[in-house]
Amino acid sequence: MCGIAGYHGLPADPALLERMNAHQQHRGPDGDGICVDGPCGLAHRRLSIIDIAHGQQPMDTADGRYAIAYNGEVYNYLDLRGELEALGRTFTTDSDTEVVLQAFAQWGADAFDRFNGMFGLAIWDRHEQRLTLARDHFGIKPLYVAMVP
């Protein structure tokens, strides 16, 4: 199972994200990454399941507006990908992560109601400076949030 971590509302701190990622090393041996943008930082440890070679995270949309750190599996991602391609969305990977990200870019938070699967995620909108956190409706993939002074 992958691991995601991050912060919002702090000064940019890549070293903090690297330490967070080090603490969740057991969550994924297949890669790690961080994204720092203003008051938001996302970290990801990867356990490759789908598109082993190209699903590195955090992942950005092609226009750079959104970044995602995601853990889970959306079982209907191929159907969603087809819908999104019909709407003009293009893809550079075969990963469900990119489908989830493109779905959010297309439909906003309404995208989550279209997902059949288990997931926890953080999506940073660079234009709106807004962090969206979401998890599957049953909480199969937990998502913990802490508010600290």
Placement of each model-derived feature along the sequence:
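N-terminus-centric sequence/structural signature that marks the extreme N-terminus
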Residues: 1-149
